[in-house]
Amino acid sequence: MAAADLAHIPDVDIDSDGVFKYVLIRVHSASRSGAPVAESKEIVRGYKWAEYHADIYDKVSGDMQKQGCDCECLGGGRISHQSQDKKIHVYGYTMAYGPAQHAISTEKIKAKYPDYEVTWANDGY
């Protein structure tokens, strides 16, 4: 996948309501025989169906590999999404991957949901 194609991968894909697990993932073009990775981007993925953070990462990384990209999980936590109140709160951590940099996650979420109040905290699980 060419670096320009990374722009076609949505920065944020989260469920519309509820409290659920999320992961922050760095996606980059698959390197060829040790060649340096030209460009990467971080994406936020959070879904109610996931029992574990690894379930999200495994699905997303599999999808990205099919598109010619490599991934690394940068951490995770939970998202509380209240669409009626237009509020999203990002918090906590994942036992498997550690805490994500919630500040990065919330900036990406704010870009997708500009009319929402988006907050974050490191506490909670």
Swiss-Prot record:
A single GO molecular function term of this UniProt record: protein histidine phosphatase activity
Protein function: Exhibits phosphohistidine phosphatase activity.
Keywords per UniProt: Acetylation, Cytoplasm, Hydrolase, Protein phosphatase
Catalytic activity: N(pros)-phospho-L-histidyl-[protein] + H2O = L-histidyl-[protein] + phosphate; N(tele)-phospho-L-histidyl-[protein] + H2O = L-histidyl-[protein] + phosphate
Species this chain originates from: Pongo abelii
Top-level division of the source organism's lineage: Eukaryota
Principal location listed in the UniProt entry: cytoplasm
This protein's name: 14 kDa phosphohistidine phosphatase
Record-listed substrate binding positions: K21, T94, M95, A96
PANTHER family: 14 KDA PHOSPHOHISTIDINE PHOSPHATASE (PTHR12258:SF10), JANUS-A/JANUS-B (PTHR12258)
Residues modified as N-acetylalanine: A2
Compartments, record wording: Cytoplasm
First-level EC class: hydrolase
Protein family per UniProt: Belongs to the janus family.
A Pfam family hit: Ocnus
Any Gene Ontology CC annotation: cytosol
Alphabetical list of InterPro entries matching this protein: Janus (IPR007702), Janus_sf (IPR038596)
Subunit annotation: Monomer.
E.C. no: 3.9.1.3
Gene field: PHPT1
Catalytic residues, chain numbering: H53 (proton acceptor)
